[in-house]
Regions:
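Short, glycine-/small- and polar/acidic-enriched structural segments
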Residues: 3-150, 174, 178-181, 191-198, ...
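Inter-helical turn/loop segments and adjacent helix faces that build the functional surface
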Residues: 149-154, 218-226
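Short acidic loop-to-helix transition motifs that present clustered carboxylates
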Residues: 41-42, 159-162
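Secondary-structure end/capping motifs
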Residues: 221-283
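A bilobed periplasmic-binding-protein/Venus flytrap-type ligand-binding module shared by bacterial periplasmic
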Residues: 89-102, 206-223, 237
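General small-molecule cofactor/ligand-binding pocket signal
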Residues: 35-37, 155-159
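Loop-centered beta-sheet repeat module
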Residues: 162-213, 217, 224
């Protein structure tokens, strides 16, 4: 008998296992029908899970830890039966800050975190830095990377990933750390310059997990196991570079991840264009 499971996600490249499991039949092979529910931001997705609107969700890896420590809003304990992604974050700056770095001689090498933060510090200007959520790997990475800057120089602002490019274009942010494809989209639509992948600050950091309400796995172990297997097989399919173009086309269909398929394909292949001049770096 086919069982339906509702899954919540925020439109990012690492929502791909959920989308691919649904579209290409990996869920069906496990006797599941997935009902995917898109959320505009992480607060909304958290609330959807807490209120039972979805049974499971793609989630920032730090959010269940913060919940267990009593940080942020209340709610039930969260279970995380599997990791969905490692890394995938991009650190970038607005067009004006990028121009200042270029005038100062920064090489935009996209790999040296120490050189990049020294260049940013040398500008000597306050920075409004966008992160997708207060309790996120992005916020932790930035805290590590920017730790040596003078007190008060950095103001972290929470901005939903799909809104990060718009916030840069409107002059509301000077820098950001966000998951793909929104760093690449910021290059396209806001003239941002990408400085580093998150892995240049800390390699192999857990980025997204599959989250379920506390007790769900224990109450329905067979169903939880089938869901994990479906997503794992979708992840295996996604790991094959030959599938990147097909995956990108599926993930960017209407009402899923609203960017050009080319940006998602580049992210899946680890080939990131870091400026409007077309500079490409492999991560």
């Amino acid at each position: 008998m086919t069982r339906e499971i509702s899954l919540g996600y925020v439109p990012l490249v690492d929502a791909a296992p959920l989308i691919i499991a649904d579209v290409l039949g990996f869920a069906e092979e496990q006797g599941l029908r997935l009902r995917l529910e898109r959320a505009a931001n992480w607060s909304m997705l958290r609330d959807m899970l807490d209120q039972g609107q979805v049974a499971a969700a793609q989630m920032l890896s730090v959010m269940p830890v913060a919940r267990a420590l009593g940080l942020g809003s209340g709610g039930s304990k969260l279970e995380t039966p599997m990791l969905l992604s490692l890394g995938g974050q991009m650190v970038g700056v607005s067009a004006p800050v990028g121009a200042g770095l270029e005038r100062a001689g920064h090489d935009f090498g996209f790999s040296d975190a120490a050189a990049a933060v020294q260049a940013v510090a040398a500008l000597g200007q306050p920075l409004r830095v966008g992160v997708p959520f207060a309790h996120s790997m992005q916020a932790l990475l930035l805290g590590d990377w920017l730790a040596g800057l003078p007190s008060g120089m950095v103001e972290l602002r929470t901005v939903a990933p799909p809104l990060m490019p718009e916030a840069l274009a409107e002059g509301e942010l000077d820098a950001f750390c966000v998951g793909e494809p929104w760093g690449s989209q910021a290059v396209v639509s806001a003239g941002a310059r990408l400085l580093l992948p998150g892995t240049a600050i800390r390699p192999a950091m857990p980025e997204k997990v599959l989250a379920l309400r506390g007790g769900w796995c224990e109450a329905q172990p067979d169903l939880a196991g089938r869901l994990v297997r479906a997503l794992s097989r979708a992840g295996g399919w996604l790991s094959n570079p030959r599938n990147a173009a097909t995956a990108a086309e599926i993930v960017t269909r209407p009402s899923r991840v609203d960017v050009a398929a080319e940006l998602v394909e580049r992210a899946l292949l680890g080939r990131i264009v870091t400026d409007r001049a077309g500079s490409e770096h492999v991560v």
